[in-house]
Amino acid sequence: MVLVASNEMESYFGDLEKRADDCYILVSKARKAGFDPALEPEIPRAKDLAERVEAQVGPPGIAPRIREVAKNNGRESTALILAKELAGELRSEGIEVALEQAVRTSLSIITEGVLVAPTEGVVRVSTMVNQNNTKCAAIYYAGPIRAAGGTAKALSVLIADVVRRELSLDSYIPTPAEIERYKEE
């Protein structure tokens, strides 16, 4: 997407960037003086969705690919396409690494890299063993997932399903007791 702005607007945005850079330099100097437990500013600078996602959950170097896919797709489709790609690319690092990274990155795309849902709302993404000894995907949620909203929560399950298929994991098989409980509820 090409943005057109007047020279005055370009100058204004350039000035904002410079002032923000100056603030980060000042904060870094203050932090290094030892008056704060953290030595660096906690919030990384990011110019767009792709940079926010990469800074929030990674993996390093994913921002250009997010931009490329997002040019021709909506946010949800972009998340699903990248989930599948990441699962395939990271498979060699281990099924659980690929599963977790793909789910977190895709959820961050859906939540625009501004909510804590991908980092704090998803406690863990791993595999678990079904009652028939096959492996399936498991997502463990915490309270901050609520901030993502119902659509993002539901899409996180869809994303995990797309990733588990890419990683050749079986689907979850509920126990008879779980089935009965759901019928009752």
Which stretches of residues belong to each language-model region?
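Extended, Lys/Arg-rich, non-catalytic nucleic-acid recognition/anchoring regions
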Residues: M1-E185
